[in-house]
Swiss-Prot record:
CDD domains: S4. Component of a heterotrimeric complex containing imp3, imp4 and mpp10. Gene3D superfamilies: RNA-binding S4 domain. Its main location: nucleus. InterPro entries: Ribosomal_uS4 (IPR022801), Ribosomal_uS4_N (IPR001912), S4_RNA-bd (IPR002942), S4_RNA-bd_sf (IPR036986). GO terms for molecular function: rRNA binding; snoRNA binding. Residues 108-174 form the S4 RNA-binding domain. This is U3 small nucleolar ribonucleoprotein protein imp3. It is found in: Nucleus, Nucleolus. The keyword rRNA-binding applies. The keyword Plastid does not apply. Component of the U3 small nucleolar ribonucleoprotein. Required for the early cleavages at sites A0, A1 and A2 during 18S ribosomal pre-RNA processing.
Length: 183
């Protein structure tokens, strides 16, 4: 017979669900969560499942015969989409898709791309700035740090017009216009 839980033990176990839990690689996943500053573990689990599914599809396409026109069309389409999303460095062979991991998806998050292009010093700072509404992509304001940035939209990442950070950067670079001072 099991004893009745004390009050503090019940409070600790209140949010624990013993019926459904995810089996994952705690050590490696924790490192990736810290490296890419992913706040929700479910997001990284989703990236891993997307990578696994894409590897499965790539393996299915590889199993088709070389002379099959469907194989060449699917290979070309899949490589084009993965290259446009920024998940593979070049779109030459199907083996590139076989090497896609959850980290490949995490590298395309907006804060990580901002750090890579030099807008911020760290991913954490970039994530905070995105959540506070300082960043836009094209004309669209983005406040979700889990936003996936494609290669084409990578060049359109800028500070919002009303952002104080943009004003400080323009003052530092001596590029602030008199017209901008009126805003």
């Amino acid at each position: 017979m099991v004893r009745k839980l004390k009050t503090h033990e019940q409070k600790l176990l209140k949010k624990t669900d013993f019926m459904s839990w995810q089996v994952d690689q705690q050590g490696k996943q924790g490192d990736m969560l810290r490296k890419f500053y992913v706040k929700k573990r479910e997001h990284y689990a989703l990236y891993n499942t997307l990578a696994a599914k894409s590897r499965e599809v790539a393996d299915l396409i590889k199993n088709l015969s070389e002379s099959d026109p469907f194989r060449s069309k699917c290979t070309e389409d899949m490589l084009t989409k993965f290259y446009a999303a920024g998940l593979v460095p070049t779109s030459d062979t199907l083996e590139r898709i076989g090497k896609v991991t959850g980290a490949s998806f995490a590298r395309r998050r907006l804060p990580v791309v901002m750090r890579n292009i030099g807008m911020c010093e760290s991913v954490k700072t970039a994530s905070d700035l995105v959540e506070q509404g300082h960043v836009r992509i094209g004309t669209k304001l983005v406040t979700d740090p889990a936003f996936m940035v494609t290669r084409s939209s990578e060049d359109m990442i800028t500070w919002t017009k009303a952002s104080k950070i943009k004003k400080h950067v323009m003052d530092y670079n001596n590029t602030r216009d008199d017209f901008d001072l009126m805003d």
